[in-house]
Amino acid sequence: MEPSKANEDFLIAKAHAKINLHLEVLGIRSDGFHELAMVMQSINLSDQLKMIKRVDNTINLKSNNKEISNGDDNLIIKASKLLRNKVENQELGVDIELEKNIPIGAGLAGGSTDAAATLLGLNKLWKLNLKTDELENLSKEIGSDIPFCISGGRQICFGRGEILEKLKFDQIQLGLILVKDPSIQVSTPVAYKKYKDQFGESYLEDDRDFEIKRNSIRSIDWSDQSLFDNRKEIQNDLQKSVRPITPEVEKSLDLLSSLPDSRLVSMSGSGPSCFALFQNYDQANKVLKEHVNEFERAGLSAWACSMMSNGVELRNEFI
């Protein structure tokens, strides 16, 4: 894939993964989906998408990961066609080359952040001039995590994850060690079903109760660094059902909890990725280097990551 001569005809998007700093399952909505209360955070484990504008209307995708479909079931293709339909211009085309670094089926929104990067990138490449909130609303049609991934940072997320309340503060200093056993994936629907089977009797039943819970989440100062010192109000409900039946998650959480200077240790989303928070990136990276052999012996892939204030970065150059 070669770029056109004009810079405006190609760009690169970095699509950041997310972790769940907090995840509560509140109950079942009238549409049958679970009502959630979450705090999500972008991190600098990222996929890269190279996009080149075509002179015809072909939408073409290729990737360095052979497990990834390049057909209509891929969220990148869905996002491209959704945007094209939105502006009612079927003549638009693009070549997209995906460098996949975020693990698949890991609870890190890898597919969702790729779709978010596609929407933001093509909005610029195709000169559509849609606003961010328009893209967020549009993206709800194909995925609940995509609206968050479009703007990223740290946000409170309600509903299925698509109702966003942005959190604003100057610095996000915390670092983390993220781990995943590459041999397994966890099915999100299975995780939610397991949780419902175990804890469904305690579900809240009406919007008034949901709103009380939402206000409780809103009342917390999510910029307070001390909040993440394994305090009881920070939780991932799905961890309660996934951990006992997934030895790889149990192993990951135990190893992370044993690390020096680790703060909050948790599973992300429906798993199986898990993370430990540290005071900053440098501390996380130092601990990872000192314990890399332990992760290798446990069969875990591990990354030291920073927290990001955005979900996607765009630039008009190849590297």
Curated annotation (Swiss-Prot):
Active site per the UniProt annotation: K18, D145
Amino-acid positions noted as binding ATP in the UniProt annotation, renumbered to this chain: P103, I104, G105, A106, G107, L108, A109, G110, G111, S112, T113
Family: Belongs to the GHMP kinase family. IspE subfamily.
Stored SUPFAM superfamilies: GHMP Kinase, C-terminal domain (SSF55060), Ribosomal protein S5 domain 2-like (SSF54211)
Keywords, ordered alphabetically: ATP-binding, Isoprene biosynthesis, Kinase, Nucleotide-binding, Transferase
Source domain of life: Bacteria
Name assigned to this protein: 4-diphosphocytidyl-2-C-methyl-D-erythritol kinase
The protein's Enzyme Commission number: 2.7.1.148
Name of encoding gene: ispE
Swiss-Prot/TrEMBL GO biological process terms: isopentenyl diphosphate biosynthetic process, methylerythritol 4-phosphate pathway; terpenoid biosynthetic process
Keyword Kinase applies: yes
Pathway the protein takes part in: Isoprenoid biosynthesis; isopentenyl diphosphate biosynthesis via DXP pathway; isopentenyl diphosphate from 1-deoxy-D-xylulose 5-phosphate: step 3/6
Residues in the signal sequence: none
Positions in coiled-coil regions: none
EC class: transferase
NCBIfam families hit by this protein: ispE, PRK14608.1
Catalytic activity: 4-CDP-2-C-methyl-D-erythritol + ATP = 4-CDP-2-C-methyl-D-erythritol 2-phosphate + ADP + H(+)
Primary role: Catalyzes the phosphorylation of the position 2 hydroxy group of 4-diphosphocytidyl-2C-methyl-D-erythritol.
